[in-house]
Structure formats: C-alpha cells, structure tokens
Amino acid sequence: WQGLHGATALVEGTWGATIHDQVAPQAGEIVVTKRGVSAFHASDLDQILHTSRIGTLLLAGVATNFVVEGTARQACDLGYDTIVVGDCCASVSQEAHDASLTVALPFLCTISNLEEVTAALK
C-alpha cells in the first residue's frame, strides 16, 4: 500500500470506493471493508468466516499479483482451502497476471476458472 498512501481513489465513503450496483450486496449480506493488501488485514473477515464455519474461499478480483495474491497468502496462513478463479482476476499487465497464477499462487492454493467453479457449485 506504500504507493497508495495519500491516494484519494479508494477512500471509504467516496465514489472511488462505492460498490457497483451490479455487484451490490443484497439485504442481510455482510460487507467487509478492506483496509490493506489482504482482505484479512485489519478487518473482521477471519472472525466472520470462522463464526459462519466457512473453510473454503473463492477469490477473484483486480490486481491478481497484488491484492488477490496477498489475500491468498494470508488465507493459506490462516488455514483456509483457497481457490483462485483465474479468469475472474485481472492485473496491470497480462504478464503480471500470468506470473501470479503460474508461479506464486499454485504453491498457496488451487487455481481454477469460472466454468469449473460454476460446475462444481451446481
């Protein structure tokens, strides 16, 4: 986050941090405010997951080699079975995205795609 300190694009309560209507939570769904590279950092995500008895995580998002990988690393440390849905992630470059999916993440979690995950959830 060092390069983002002082940035105004992702400030809670501003347009840049607003959840888009197409993915907005439904009534009663939990929203966790992300405060660091990993979704677990300085949040109650781990407690929420444990309380809900959730042991498997599906990760997708922007910045494969940064945010997704950071969250996967901490999820691994916390003992979660983690699946990264690779074709539902993006990064600043295809090279960075591919490197994360082929070099670092396979040591931490399972790499899958949307088609496989959707079929497994049916």
Name these PLM-found stretches.
Residues 1-122:
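Active-site-adjacent betaalpha module
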